[in-house]
């Protein structure tokens, strides 16, 4: 009986080790699937609109200014009342300048806030170069990667909420991979159509010790004009109504 029990215990241990090894492999293999799920959530399967209120620190002229975000597919149209207009895609950012669409300058910001236009791009896995999981715990899955294309950043560290399939925190490193430039936190998520959208975005700059807070009120927008998602649309007034 002692030998039988010992053999059984040995098989149990081996089975547990095999299960743990399989779990580790599954976690490693699931990164691509997780990023695809995050991209699916970030994408606007149906058009949506956010009425945005900007709050920023001393010296920031944009504080109190309303803005509008309109999303469709992988495109985000951005308009700041009385000023900036932009069409943001993962691989291209256009702004209205001189009555036509022009490439955004590297590092161009949302008004004069701590938020770069590229920070607002709809997430796709293609924007990350060799992403790796650096932590996986109750606070979320931490994915570290360099940007794959042209970017103002040297390194991005994203924390992903597995349940919502949404990025809830980002660390942005500029110039060098150990030079933290700013942090972003997304909160107050609401379900809009098939996706989770943040009701609050807070960006804090480490270098300037400044902070920008965006409050977003999302809703579905099935009647959004197609022209706003075309470069030519930046050459004419949007015709959007303001709250």
Please give the residue ranges for each predicted region:
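Bacterial N-terminal signal peptides that target proteins for export
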Residues: 2-13
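Bacterial N-terminal signal peptides
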Residues: 13-21
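N-terminal mature ectodomain segment of secretory-pathway/periplasmic proteins
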Residues: 29-98
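Flexible, processing/modification-adjacent segments and terminal tails
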Residues: 29-35, 43-44, 84, 88-156, ...
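Short solvent-exposed loop/turn micro-motifs enriched in small/polar/acidic residues
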Residues: 59-62, 79-80, 126, 151-153, ...
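Short amphipathic beta-strand/extended segments with alternating polar/hydrophobic composition
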Residues: 63-67, 87-91, 101-108, 157, ...
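Gly/Pro-enriched, hydrophobic low-complexity segments
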Residues: 136-230
């Amino acid at each position: 009986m002692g030998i039988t029990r010992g053999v059984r215990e040995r098989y149990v241990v081996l089975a547990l080790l095999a299960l743990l090894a399989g779990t580790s492999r599954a976690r490693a293999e699931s990164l691509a699937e997780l990023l695809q799920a995050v991209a699916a959530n970030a994408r606007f399967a149906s058009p949506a609109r956010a009425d945005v209120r900007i709050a920023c620190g001393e010296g920031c002229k944009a504080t109190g200014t309303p803005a509008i975000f309109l999303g469709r597919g992988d495109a985000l149209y951005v308009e700041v009342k009385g000023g900036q207009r932009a069409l943001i895609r993962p691989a291209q950012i256009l702004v209205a300048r001189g009555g036509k669409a022009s490439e955004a300058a590297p590092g161009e910001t949302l008004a004069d806030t701590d938020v770069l236009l590229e920070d607002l791009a709809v997430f796709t896995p293609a924007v990350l170069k060799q992403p790796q999981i650096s932590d996986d715990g109750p606070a979320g899955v931490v994915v570290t990667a360099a940007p794959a294309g042209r970017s103002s950043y040297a390194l991005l560290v994203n924390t992903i909420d597995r349940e919502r399939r949404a990025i809830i925190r980002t660390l942005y490193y500029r110039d060098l991979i150990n030079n933290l430039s700013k942090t972003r936190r997304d909160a107050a998520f609401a379900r809009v159509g098939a996706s989770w959208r943040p009701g609050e975005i807070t960006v804090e700059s480490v270098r300037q010790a400044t902070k920008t807070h965006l409050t977003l009120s999302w809703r579905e927008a099935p009647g959004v004009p197609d022209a706003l998602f075309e470069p030519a649309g930046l050459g004419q007034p949007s015709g959007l109504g303001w709250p």
